[in-house]
Amino acid sequence: MARRKKKQAPWRRWLRRFVIVVLGFVAVSFLLVLPLRWVAPVTTAFMLQDDSGRDPLMYEWVDWPQLGERLALAVVASEDQRFADHFGLDVAAIRKSIDEKDDRGYLRGASTISQQTVKNIFLWPGRSFARKGLEAWLTVVAEICLPKRRILEIYLNVAEFGPGIYGAGAASRYYYGSSPDRLTDAQAALLASVLPNPRRLRVDNPSDYVRERQAWVISQMQRLRREGWISRLSP
């Protein structure tokens, strides 16, 4: 007489399904992010959702050597000076930015460059806990899969610098008729000063706040340059 197969407890079945779903989610996450180590994104989620009215959107990929040190330093100075030190999430900086929110209502530094990169490429605008949680997870995956210099290279190429203007290459040519590696400190600092809200803060019509921010970014660029900051990025 054949032995009857012992019936599996329902909780074990649900646990097995849960583990399969989690492992599948992890695998898909790495499959999405890892190719960015070698392949430039053709488009991003933010570009696909763009409602600026610009048609076609302005976007061109520029490799790291042609991006230039000035713009890299300017963006790091403006957005994430601890970029080389943290693992994608900088809780201390988030708390500090909330405490130092100025009287104009501008909130700076709430997201690291790594977070902004994965948000622009894979996600959608919004502040829901689900989106923030997914952003945090993909940021960790990006930090595992990609060197710091590659993350910064991608960010400089996909960040929006004006309505429908994506990446340093398109922004440099549109605003200055130049390639990114030929920008002056002042030009690079002005581009960086409108991040991460280029619809409200404008390069072509800078407010007093943007000009103040530009001057501060220039001073921070000079400090980072003296410290040899760029040399800290692994290729």
Short names for language-model regions:
Residues 2-235:
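Juxtamembrane regions of bacterial inner-membrane/periplasmic proteins
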